[in-house]
Amino acid sequence: MQHRDNPEKAPLSDAPTVVEDRAADYRHASVLLDGAVEALMTDPDGCYLDGTFGRGGHSRAILQRLSPQGRLLAIDRDPAALAEGATWDDPRFTLRHGRFAELDDIARDAALHRRLSGVLLDVGVSSPQLDDASRGFSFLRDGPLDMRMDPTQGESAADWLARVSERDMSDVFKRYGEERFARRIAKAIVARRGERPITHTADLAELVKAAHPAWEKGKHPATRVFQAIRIHVNGELDQLEAALAAALESLAPGGRLVVISFHSLEDRLVKRFIRDKVRGDTHLPRDLPIRDTQLNRRLAMVGKARRPDEDEIALNPRARSAVMRVAQKLG
């Protein structure tokens, strides 16, 4: 989907030319694009950080609204995303290789620690990653069972399945996939790997399908298992928790934190983080007179959680489960 610019948000006439929109080449549409960027950008002259560059959908929209004095720092650990960003020619834009959990260190290196006007995190796997069979994220396309966000680092899904105990495998399926039949599926996988290695996505998908006794309507039986393995292999929830804390440290007072998540585990983590920072130090004695400043409230909520409307879902069905939450750092 090509992004249609709002005329009121058009690039400034003297701003550098924004990189050509090549999102269509990847059949990828950034979810909640306009809403996220509008919530993020309180100052066109500010410094912003896109913690999940992907194929640049959000970064491109930020640059379109950024003045010549503004600055955008983006991060990604996917080599394909880095290759896309390397083609961009805009003096306001810098792309760094790294995990979004490292964003405070990356911001420090760029002399932007506590100077950021906004941090955007678009969490989870991207459409280009799902659509590329060689990455091993999707049960709909046969390919090597990899699932790593950065294929140059860490253990692949196939390697993990080959060595993990049945009990630990079941725990991962239950914790990260909320899979009711985790034990049954883990047992089937362990039995199969005793006969031959499970190395491809189609092998795993068919195995889970055969072992699953009750399919959810409209959902492939392997959906939850693939999600669980991907989250575990990439340490996604630990990374997200660290990224939220790092974002809070990197923001300037008044800076915005915008997070888009795609499943309940992510959203619960984000919701809890924002809620706790809005409430402040709730462990202080309730029977003592306490000034508001003593509560050490770090964030203020900005609006309610937002979901894509039906028009966006019709254009991009993968947006259906997205939730966006916005908070502002207090001084």
Swiss-Prot record:
Please, which domain of life does this record's source organism belong to? Bacteria
InterPro entries, per database record: RsmH, SAM-dep_MeTrfase_MraW_recog, SAM-dependent_MTases_sf
Cellular location of this protein?
Cytoplasm
Which leading EC class covers this enzyme? transferase
Which SUPFAM superfamilies does the record associate with it?
Answer: Putative methyltransferase TM0872, insert domain, S-adenosyl-L-methionine-dependent methyltransferases
Can the keyword Isomerase be found in this entry's annotation? no
> Which reaction is the catalytic activity of this chain?
cytidine(1402) in 16S rRNA + S-adenosyl-L-methionine = N(4)-methylcytidine(1402) in 16S rRNA + S-adenosyl-L-homocysteine + H(+)
Which residues are listed for S-adenosyl-L-methionine binding in this entry? 56-58, 76, 100, 122, 129
Function field? Specifically methylates the N4 position of cytidine in position 1402 (C1402) of 16S rRNA.
- Family statement drawn from the similarity comment of this UniProt entry: Belongs to the methyltransferase superfamily. RsmH family.
**What NCBIfam families does the record tag this protein with?**
16S rRNA (cytosine(1402)-N(4))-methyltransferase RsmH
Name assigned to this protein: Ribosomal RNA small subunit methyltransferase H
The source organism is Chromohalobacter salexigens (strain ATCC BAA-138 / DSM 3043 / CIP 106854 / NCIMB 13768 / 1H11)
Q: What is the lineage of its organism?
A: Bacteria, Pseudomonadati, Pseudomonadota, Gammaproteobacteria, Oceanospirillales
> Which gene produces this protein?
rsmH
